[in-house]
């Protein structure tokens, strides 16, 4: 996790059993209420979408740019309504979306940004790694991806320090550490989605970041 943070240039990263778990956690932390909408590219993998649907959000599908196969600030803006809460940006095939423009739009509208960078680890936009612009970044170490473990693995990056403080327990059965300021010993969690230690040991010696 520390090496990953150093590589992509962010303060908080959490190793998971796969990237879908990262999207599930991000969707959980967005805290959707009835009627909330999430904007998702019309061209993506199912894991980019169904975690948000499971949490009760209504999906608005954004068009992609025909040349880069990723969304743009313009295609996203067409989908924004007074119910929009989250934008999911998917960086595909090594193409990074124009994140400075998308982040400017998100900040103007007060929207959460989740970056699905499962197919774009190491891609830079204006000198900054994708997955580090938004509130959440999700990466995959599946055997078909840029960096691999022994079959599956993922990483979730977060900007918010408070969220970073609770993520270790959210990914591990809601189990609070003994030094955690808590009202109860257990918190609502996804289950156990930690990256297996064996995968972590395999990841770094066999990849070159």
Q: Model-predicted segments: where are they?
A:
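Active-site region of PLP-dependent enzymes
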Residues: 120-126, 133-209
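Active-site nucleotide-sugar/metal-binding loop of Leloir-type enzymes
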Residues: 79-81, 129-134
